[in-house]
Structures are given as structure tokens and as C-alpha cells.
Swiss-Prot record:
Protein name as it appears in the record: Iron-sulfur cluster assembly protein CyaY
Superkingdom assignment: Bacteria
GO cellular component, one term: cytosol
UniProt cross-references to Gene3D superfamilies, sorted A to Z: Frataxin/CyaY
GO MF terms held by the record: ferric iron binding; ferrous iron binding
Any matching Pfam family: Frataxin_Cyay
Organism of this sequence: Shewanella sp. (strain ANA-3)
Length: 109
């Protein structure tokens, strides 16, 4: 059965919250310098060097889109996980690795 918009937003919001919590922990424990801006369907992370990672809910497609300095990625919900449509990678390890590569900040989820 197809996911409803309500289910999509709940899953995406839970994921956004997990990312925000992990970053707040990194700020406390690693003195990380990250600005978090959650507004509507977008979660934007800005690092001390001015670079950004933007995570965006695409409701019509029920996808999560991520823009990093390394490229853009689209994740769909498959078998209980958010999966990159191009390479099959999972969302949370991807975000963790992207933040580490882009800012040097190690997150724990």
C-alpha cells in the first residue's frame, strides 16, 4: 500500500528530529559550530566555513532530497528505510558521512 502524505511527514519529521538532536549533542560534546535552521519542509545545516547541507521534504514524490557540497541526492522510503535512488545507500549513514566529510563533525545516531 502506498504511503499517505501524513505518514510521509511523520517519518520525515522523526528523521529531521534525530538529525537535530545528534547535532545538538555534537555542539555540546565537541564544541561543534553548526547553525540549524528548520523551516517548513527544509532542514538547513550551516557550518563554520559557510558551507551548507540542505535536507528537503518532497511531499508530491514522498522523497527526501539532500544537497551537499558534493552533489544532490534523492531518497525514497523502501522496506522501512530511506534509500538513495542512485546507489542504494541508506539515508542516516549518508548524512553522517556527509557531515563528517563537509565539516569534520562526527555525529552519533
Amino acid at each position: 500500500m502506498a504511503m499517505t502524505d501524513t505518514e510521509f511527514h511523520q517519518l520525515a519529521d522523526d528523521m529531521f528530529q534525530a538529525i537535530e538532536t545528534a547535532i545538538e549533542t555534537a555542539i555540546d560534546e565537541q564544541d561543534a559550530d553548526v547553525d540549524i535552521d528548520a523551516s517548513g519542509n527544509v532542514l538547513q545545516l550551516e557550518f563554520v566555513d559557510g558551507s551548507k547541507i540542505v535536507i528537503n521534504k518532497q511531499e508530491p514524490l514522498h522523497e527526501i532530497w539532500v544537497a551537499t557540497r558534493f552533489g544532490g541526492y534523492h531518497f525514497g522510503f523502501v522496506d522501512g528505510k530511506w534509500i538513495d535512488g542512485r546507489n542504494g545507500g541508506e539515508f542516516m549513514p549518508f548524512v553522517q558521512d556527509s557531515i563528517l566529510r563537509q565539516s569534520g563533525i562526527a555525529l552519533s545516531f
